[in-house]
Swiss-Prot record:
It catalyses: heme b + (2E,6E)-farnesyl diphosphate + H2O = Fe(II)-heme o + diphosphate. Its EC number is 2.5.1.141. It comes from Caulobacter sp. (strain K31). Disulfide bonds: none annotated. Its main location: membrane. Converts heme B (protoheme IX) to heme O by substitution of the vinyl group on carbon 2 of heme B porphyrin ring with a hydroxyethyl farnesyl side group. Carbon 2 of the heme B porphyrin ring is defined according to the Fischer nomenclature. This is Protoheme IX farnesyltransferase. Pathway: Porphyrin-containing compound metabolism; heme O biosynthesis; heme O from protoheme: step 1/1. One of its GO terms (molecular function) is protoheme IX farnesyltransferase activity. Pfam families: UbiA.
Length: 345
């Protein structure tokens, strides 16, 4: 797919009314995504339950935050053409003309080098290597290749967003055992139903931008099926830390109850097309517009309602899982000793 950094006629017709501010450069770093990355990395660092000097711990988290910001800046530089075509992203600094593409790219490269080198010299090179791999995988493999060429883009590309707990654990201990990778697996399996729920009700947005998200390529019915399948795989994996010497009773309760809600919402999404004779593609049915109109009335309906509910709860569920692990580590709560599957710490 050819790539162009030229703004749309609509954007070009509206000149920038101000120079870039520091907030615009900060937005390049995707602060909301960065906050989730930092949170899961911090959980990994503390869940290792290995003493680490507070200053070194802070430096490690800072490096991970900078690395996440670097990935975001590189993504916004390369995806400026796509972002300009989508309602959800056209207000970003580069397509708006507030920050030049080359400035975003330069910021991303500089922050990437800074975060990896600082992590290696101040913490350890295993954590630095994992951080470097994460940045390259997200900025190059996902952004420049997978996102534009395959409907499995967020499945494979989700590895980049799943790695921060392992980076945090490696920063604290100098190694990354199976329990660290179990946290990675949780995020990896959580990513597809999370993003596919979003893509269900903005599928036309993706279609107009030429992004081959699953609903665009395979349709809504197949997407709902995949959401349910990944949800069925996710729930037992989320329960696993309680049986591997990683989580305690608090985590078991949160993962169990939250998992039931998550699975219930996924089933509702799956059943929302039951009995339909056809599987309308985005060109025939704009779920984004349907959902927006319904939301304004205060009564989201049908596809938009169920997809929105799952998308919103998926964020809460992931946060609750890692918050439970974090709370148990900080408070020194005992882990369960069920001896079902003992993984090395």
């Amino acid at each position: 797919m050819a790539r162009s950094t030229v703004l749309t006629p609509e954007d070009e017709a509206t000149p920038a009314v101000r120079h870039a501010r520091w907030q615009d450069y900060f937005q390049l770093m995707k602060p909301r995504v960065m906050s989730l990355v930092v949170f899961t990395a911090l959980t990994g660092l503390l869940a290792a339950r290995t003493p680490i000097h507070p200053l070194l711990g802070a430096v490690a988290v800072l490096c991970i935050a900078i690395g996440a910001g670097a990935s975001g800046a590189l993504n916004m530089w390369y995806d400026a053409d796509i972002d300009a075509k989508m309602r959800r992203t056209r207000g970003r600094p580069v397509p708006m003309g507030l920050v030049k593409g080359e400035e975003a790219a330069t910021l991303g490269v500089v922050l990437s080098l800074l975060s990896v080198m600082l992590m290696g010299m101040a913490i350890n090179w295993l954590a630095a290597g994992l951080l470097a791999f994460t940045i390259v995988f997200y900025a190059v493999v996902y952004t420049m290749w997978l996102k534009r060429w395959t409907a499995q883009n967020i499945v494979i590309g989700g590895l980049a967003g799943a790695l921060p707990p392992a980076i945090g654990w490696a920063a604290a201990t100098g190694h990354a055992p199976l329990n660290a990778w179990l946290m990675v697996l949780i995020i990896f399996l959580w990513t597809p139903p999370h993003f596919w729920a979003l893509s269900l009700y903005i599928s036309t947005d993706y279609a107009k931008a030429g992004v081959p998200m699953l609903p665009v390529v395979k349709g809504a019915k197949e997407t709902r099926k995949q959401i349910l399948l990944y949800s069925l795989a996710l729930i037992p994996v989320c329960l696993a830390p309680a049986f591997t010497g990683l989580g305690g009773w608090l985590y078991l309760a949160v993962s169990g109850l939250g998992g039931l809600v998550f699975l219930t919402l996924a089933v509702r999404v799956f059943r929302s097309l039951a009995g339909e004779a056809s599987d309308p593609r985005p060109a025939d049915r704009d779920l984004y517009e349907v959902g927006e109109a319904a939301a304004k009335r205060g009564k989201p309906v049908g596809d938009a309602k169920h997809a929105r509910n799952l998308f919103a709860f998926s964020i809460l569920y992931l946060f609750a899982l890692f918050a439970a692990l974090l709370a148990e580590a900080v408070l020194g709560l005992p882990i369960l000793n069920l001896h079902v599957l003992e993984l090395p710490l």
